[in-house]
Amino acid sequence: MDFKNKKWLFLAPLAGYTDLPFRSVVKKFGVDVTTSEMVSSHSLVYAFDKTSKMLEKSPLEDHFMAQISGSKESVVKEAVEKINALDHVSGIDFNCGCPAPKVANHGNGSGLLKDLNHLVEILKVIRENTNKKITSVKVRLGFEKKIPKEIAHALNDAPVDYVVVHGRTRSDRYQKDKIDYESIALMKKILKKPVIANGEIDSVKKAFEVLQITQADGLMIGRATLRAPWIFWQIRNNTTELPAVVKKDLVLEHFDKMVEFYGDRGVIMFRKNLHAYAKGEMQASAFRNCVNTLTEIKSMRESIEEFFNQEMLQSEVPLWVELNQKSV
């Protein structure tokens, strides 16, 4: 990955959202790097046949990172060895940012920010045992309080190719007013490796503001893509215009990919995606109530076609959606 000639654009891992069907849709809008949903090392080691489905990728994904979490070096080592057998995976991203209590309170995710020496040792284990070309880490600014300097200095000793920084602490969760790009800028000055800025990037204007403040080598965007997967195309072309795509066709394509990947179960799983796509449109509440009752492919597809009729759309402005607390 050459960070000298362009600013790289990354799709953030979002639990329950950034599966293969969604990533394949977003990839068409120019995102450079896609990342799997977070997978625990324990699940990879002890339930690989089931968990490995989360690490499948579409033919469109040329830079595909598998994101793993964990705190036990021996288990992380075994998980890395499992991923070694997956030739389509470009690299491993280690999660040190997940704020969910069931993750962080057990020393995983953002919980590792309380023991930076241990974090660095795990990153060394990953590098020493992976056969992939790329190793990266995603962090927050700290656990209870901000410690950007300490994290940056520690990661200078870690064998990673780039660092993704989410501009909040674990205790900040996803509070919009807590985002701190200045601390990302501070880490960028200290780190001797590329830095990717993440958090609250929901428009082209915001993207360029964050790049200016942080001087980051790229951007990682998550929640905004659920409503507007074309945001990467807009950033790459520095425009607020929309790409030549009919929203109904995009939603239907995503739905069809869900059914193809998950079977009939994909109908129910797609409800949350429809909630995001419909936000800001007239009759969105009624539509959500409707799709929450549908379980059959035919009836769901008909409802999508009716609601997302081009003439009904009132807004194509990227909007935020609320996610579950597992999302990073």
Curated annotation (Swiss-Prot):
GO molecular function per UniProt: flavin adenine dinucleotide binding; tRNA binding; tRNA dihydrouridine synthase activity
Disulfide bonds: none
Main enzyme class: oxidoreductase
Positions bound to FMN: 13-15, 67, 138, 198-200, 222-223
Region forming the signal peptide: none
Active site per UniProt: 98
The keyword Hydrolase appears for this protein: no
Family that this chain belongs to: Belongs to the Dus family.
Function: Catalyzes the synthesis of 5,6-dihydrouridine (D), a modified base found in the D-loop of most tRNAs, via the reduction of the C5-C6 double bond in target uridines.
Protein's UniProt name: Probable tRNA-dihydrouridine synthase
Species this protein is from: Helicobacter pylori (strain J99 / ATCC 700824)
Annotated gene: dus
